[in-house]
Amino acid sequence: LEYREKAGSIGVAFTYNEPLVGYEYVRDCARLLKEHGLATVLVTNGFLCRKPWEALLPLVDAANIDLKGFTPEFYQWLQGDLETVKTNIRLAVEVGCHVEVTTLVIPGKNDGEEDMEKEARWLASLSPDLPLHISRYFPRWHLDLPPTPVETVYHLAALARKWLKYVYEGNC
């Protein structure tokens, strides 16, 4: 908190790894930040059980939640669960947290038009004002698929704009 005053910071963003693996740390820091009138931002995969998520939400001012795809099969490939992430996005929107969603498009995995249309429609059912960031994938670590063509990102963004007002292309 002392450094914040020197730097003029308005709060803390928990990001660049999955912050919720340290749930108690994030919760305790967010509580302290809230007590001092500072903002808490989460950049998360949104994969957390409902009860701790609901306990954390009143302490969070904004969240960017990864919606990694829109099929159960894709989430199984990732060893996650689509319905848990969708529920957590919905709950965050319902409590009035500023929510933005990011989808990293991976060629041959989650780059289908039908999936993006379903995702955009579902997000718009929560709010057509919900920002969606559609990001381009680049090969890293063990996943050696080719990078997402820029044209694919722009095409999927154009599809999403049929339902959402704020769609942004990333990593292009």
Task: Give residue spans per PLM region.
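C-terminal accessory regions of radical SAM enzymes
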Residues: E114, Y154-C172
